[in-house]
Design a protein with these regions (language model features):
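Adenosine-phosphate binding glycine-rich loop
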Residues: 1-6, 103, 109-215
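Glycine-rich phosphate/diphosphate-binding loop of Rossmann-like nucleotide-binding domains
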Residues: 1-78
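Extended interaction regions within the primary functional domain
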Residues: 5, 15-18, 44, 83, ...
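Residue-level recognition of the N-termini of beta-strands and the immediately preceding loop/turn
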Residues: 18-21, 47, 101-105, 140
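Conserved active-site and cofactor/substrate-binding residues in soluble primary-metabolism enzymes
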Residues: 26, 30, 34, 68, ...
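Short, acidic Gly/Pro/Ser/Thr-rich loop/turn segments
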Residues: 30-32, 81, 112, 150
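Short, solvent-exposed amphipathic alpha-helical segments in soluble enzyme
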Residues: 38-42, 89-93, 121-122, 158-163
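Rossmann-like adenosine-cofactor binding region
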Residues: 55-138
Length: 215
């Protein structure tokens, strides 16, 4: 954290307004909240962190000028469908020397997804080599480690277990009642196995899609 705070201060010293600005997309999720907490602990003022989620990204279509106008961009979304890119090569070229953006942290790491909202790089990075440059763009680095939770294994395991355990405890409710899934889908009885109802519905949807395509 000391190195990170030092890096933030270096950025601050080179800014006329003496601010280090960041934009977090997916700010209301677990990763987004963690990113904001990390930024603040690293010396970025909370007021200088733009916190976007579905409301902001739905209000207008990307690419977003606000990204290139920020020092740091952190992508924490869960990508479930095709969306316009958050930032692309054209936006970066248009910004030119006026670009403030210097670092992108792509927590989502959708590099192999055809709907990748950050289509300016194509490789994942590692703890040993955490950054990769953006082709054709000077002074812009991307962190795209697709197993970031392993950096904090205990904390990650505890957080995941905390969220998973309630659903595991609901499983007997489903296993002991063959009509429970149908009932839960109608009643949305969260806390009585509804997560398994949604999982069953999603499985059946994709199974039907696979059969339709000859799988």
């Amino acid at each position: 954290l000391k190195r990170t705070r030092a890096a933030v201060e270096v950025i601050r010293e080179h800014r006329q307004d003496k601010r280090v600005t960041a934009l977090v997309i997916g700010a209301l999720g677990r990763c987004g909240r963690g990113a904001i907490d990390c930024l603040v602990k690293s010396g970025v003022q909370l007021d200088d962190v733009a916190r976007w989620d579905l409301q902001e990204t739905s209000a207008k279509s990307g690419p977003y000028q606000e990204i290139v106008d920020s020092d740091l961009f952190i992508n924490c979304i869960y990508l479930s469908k095709k969306i316009p890119p958050f930032v692309d090569a054209a936006l970066l070229q248009q910004a030119g020397s006026n670009r403030r953006l210097g670092t992108i942290v792509d927590v989502s790491c959708d590099t192999t997804n055809p709907h990748n909202p950050i289509p300016i790089y194509s490789v994942n990075t590692t703890f040993e080599r955490p950054t990769v440059g953006v082709p054709g763009v000077d002074g812009l680095e991307v962190i795209s480690i697709d197993h970031l939770p392993t950096l904090l294994p205990r904390e990650s395991s505890e957080a995941f277990s905390h969220d998973l355990l309630p659903s595991l405890l609901q499983l007997p409710y489903i296993q002991n009642d063959e009509h429970a899934l149908d009932a839960l889908q109608k009643e949305h009885a969260e806390g009585q196995g509804a997560v398994w109802a949604r999982a069953e519905k999603l499985f059946q949807h994709h199974m039907a899609d696979a059969v339709a395509h000859g799988a």
